[in-house]
Design a protein with these regions (language model features):
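Conserved beta-strand positions in the central sheet of alpha/beta enzyme cores
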Residues: 2-5, 41, 79, 141-144, ...
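Active-site acidic/histidine proton-transfer and metal-coordination neighborhood
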Residues: 11-114, 124-125, 135
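Histidine-acidic metal/acid-base catalytic patches
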Residues: 95-210
Length: 210
């Protein structure tokens, strides 16, 4: 297992709950280390009603930095994702908007926080995938290969059949020396057939681009 995905809610308006979220994540780090899992996908938190932009960013930055210190003790690597809305949450990701995601990215420099770039979520927000990827490229560690059939909302589809610009993405990261993990996020509900088609497509495109 290469990656464990977690759902820390560091933008919760209750400070006590934010502290609990950090404790939960610390336990996840410990579990991952015991299982030999290197990467831990982390998020900023939910877009709770009433939480101001500046407060949410401040809290997310504070707790992500603290989380990185804990992760280092366990020898695991936290990777921050441009997420949309996980089924486990009531609200969308606070940093689903591309400008918030990149601001949190910029404010967590030099603490060991790397990036897991999802190929569909920026499109689902309605922003420019390549523009955002270019900004976070210096700390790119892993990729979630996913696709969406619509812009402005997330509608998972068979990988390679939607709007995600895989050739452009792979070309850019290859040019910049990326040789990390590309994880398949198959959401077209086709079971193993969908996973096999996604793997074939990703391998084909990766092999074709320079």
């Amino acid at each position: 297992v290469t990656m464990m995905t977690t759902y820390p809610d560091f933008t919760h308006p209750d400070k006590q709950q934010r502290e609990r979220e950090l404790e939960y994540l610390a336990f996840d780090f410990a579990q991952a280390a015991q299982l030999g899992i290197k990467y831990i996908r982390v998020l900023a938190g939910q877009a709770h009603p009433g939480v101001k932009r500046e407060d949410g960013i401040m809290w997310a930055v504070e707790y992500l930095k603290r989380a990185c210190g804990i992760a280092a003790k366990y020898g695991v690597v936290p990777v921050y994702e441009d997420h949309a809305k996980p089924g486990a949450w009531d609200y969308i990701d606070f940093s689903h908007p591309a400008d918030i995601f990149t601001e949190i990215y910029e404010k967590t420099e030099d603490v060991g926080l790397r990036v897991n770039f999802d190929t569909a979520n920026i499109i689902a927000y309605g922003a420019d995938t390549m523009e955002v990827l270019q900004k976070v490229l210096p700390r790119l560690e892993t990729i979630h290969a996913a696709d969406t059939s619509t812009r402005g909302t997330l509608n998972h589809c068979e990988i390679g059949k939607g709007l995600a610009p895989f050739r452009e993405i792979f070309s850019l990261i290859k040019e910049n020396g990326f040789d990390g993990w590309i994880c398949i996020e198959e959401g077209s509900m086709q079971g193993m057939d969908g996973i096999e088609k996604a793997v074939r497509y990703v391998r084909k495109v990766w092999g074709e681009v320079k």
